[in-house]
Structures are given as C-alpha cells and as structure tokens.
Design a protein with these regions (language model features):
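Gram-negative outer-membrane beta-barrel transporters
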Residues: 1-67
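Flexible, solvent-exposed coil segments and beta strand-coil junctions
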Residues: 15-24, 74-82, 136-141
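C-terminal beta-signal and adjacent terminal beta-strands/loops
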Residues: 50, 59-76, 95, 102-163
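Outer-membrane beta-barrel transmembrane domain signature
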Residues: 82-97, 163
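Extracellular loop and loop/strand-boundary signature of outer-membrane beta-barrel proteins
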Residues: 24-29, 83-87, 142-147
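Transmembrane beta-barrel architecture of outer-membrane proteins
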Residues: 6, 30, 34-40, 93-99, ...
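Generic detector of contiguous secondary-structure segments
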Residues: 40, 46-48, 77-88, 105
Length: 163
C-alpha cells in the first residue's frame, strides 16, 4: 500500500488598470479548483497468491464557492448580494472503498490471464457535495441547495482479461 499527501494553494487576482470593477477589488482570492489538502491511503493484503483485499481512503478539502450573504429589493423583485469571490467552501470530500480481488489463473507463462474483483465504492455512503446553488423562495428567503454525487454505497463487479 501507500500514503500520499499534498498541500497546495492556488489563488488568482484580477487587476483593472482603472482600479474599478476588478474581482474582489483586485485582492487575491482562491481559485475555483483550489484544494489545499489532498490525502490518499491505499492498502492491499494478499491472503494467498490468488486472493487479496484492497482498501482505498480519499480525503480532500472542499472547493471554494461564492455565496449570497444578503438580499435587496430591486425592480419589483429580490436580488442577491454575494460574498467576496470564493470566500466559502463546500464540505470536505471523503470516500472509503473496499474490494476482494481474485486471480484464478496465476501462471506467468500463460498466454491469457484473467482476474475479477468484487467491491464497494463509498462504503460509508457519505453524500459528498459536488455543487451548491442558491435561489430565493416565494417569501424572498435565500435557499441553499447541495448537489451530491454517489450519495450511497455502490457495489461493483470487475472482470479483467489480458492476452
């Protein structure tokens, strides 16, 4: 197995020659793809030369987003006033996967080789947030909505054939 960790910071700044209309007033802000912390842990264990199990844990900081912080009335309707660019983050991403791997033919001199795996992605069923969007309801209240992908454990069967 192995363990990896990465720390990185990605920021942007827009400069306007006149000093007006620049994003965040010309100050640095986190890029949409900024993920300061990213860690992965992979573990494998062989019971025999044909049967093994594997596990994978994945963690990363949530992506930066811009959120509405207030509302105001304009032209007979409500408009949203937003925070500084990317000053908030969606929840962190975490996932844990497991698999049972079987290699029935394990001869190095064989012309063909096949194996299969049975496993589960996202064993914990964590609802990792992919995107967040905002709107206002009929009373003008700001409503936040989270779009989650793979919000449940996903079983799989994999068959590999090599020649």
């Amino acid at each position: 197995g192995w363990l990896s960790y990465t720390y990185s910071k990605t920021q942007l700044r827009e400069r306007d020659e006149r000093g007006i209309n620049a994003i965040n007033g010309g100050k640095w802000y986190d890029a949409s793809y900024d993920k300061p912390h990213d860690a992965k842990l992979v573990a494998n264990y062989k019971f025999t030369h044909r049967v093994s199990i594997s596990a994978n844990a994945d963690y990363s900081t949530g992506r930066p987003i811009t959120v509405p912080v207030a509302k105001y009335e304009y032209g007979g309707g409500y408009r949203l006033y937003y925070s500084d660019r990317n000053s908030y983050r969606i929840p962190d991403y975490m996932r844990f996967d497991v698999a049972l791997n079987i290699e029935p033919t394990h001869k190095n001199d064989a012309f063909t080789h096949f194996s299969f795996s049975i496993g589960v992605y996202n064993v914990t069923g964590r609802k990792n947030v992919y995107s967040v969007y905002f709107d206002t309801d009929a009373q003008g209240q700001i409503q936040g909505h989270q779009l989650c992908i793979f919000g449940a454990p996903i079983p799989y069967v994999n068959f590999n054939f090599k020649f």
